[in-house]
Regions:
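Short alpha-helical segments that sit at the start of domains
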Residues: 1-26
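Short acidic, hydrophobic short linear motifs in intrinsically disordered regions
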Residues: 25-35
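Short helix-coil junctions and helix-kink-helix linkers
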Residues: 33-43
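Short amphipathic alpha-helical interaction segments
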Residues: 42-57
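A short, conserved structural fragment
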Residues: 56-66
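Minor-groove-contacting beta-hairpin "wing" of winged helix-turn-helix DNA-binding domains
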Residues: 68-74
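Short, amphipathic alpha-helical interaction segments positioned at domain boundaries
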Residues: 76-98
Length: 98
């Protein structure tokens, strides 16, 4: 697996896990980018938008434009993937105990 693919799969999982811990199960794209940075996942704004668009296509999150950011809300399917109860190719599966 290429490093870029590994990074993308990890970023997708990180977004989902962040949303499961957020009040109302939602956040905005700017805060999500900052959270990824804290985990040494350095993605551009365009890359974050691509990650979010992919997660929407998979039915794992919904988004709503609000000014220059997107408000992102996790779906039940996304919560299942974040917990490792369900798997989606393209999202890193959490390790036991994560």
């Amino acid at each position: 697996m290429k490093y870029s693919q590994f990074l993308t799969e990890h970023a997708r999982l990180c977004v989902l896990r962040t949303l499961t811990e957020s009040a109302g199960y939602q956040s905005n794209s700017s805060l999500l980018r900052d959270h990824l940075e804290a985990y040494a996942l350095h993605l551009s704004a365009d890359q974050i938008n691509a990650v979010l668009a992919w997660l929407v296509e998979q039915g794992l999150v919904t988004t709503e434009a609000l000014g220059s950011v997107q408000v992102v809300t996790i779906t039940q399917r996304g919560m299942d993937v974040a917990r490792g109860v369900a798997t989606v190719p393209g999202v890193r599966r959490p390790s036991p105990g994560e």
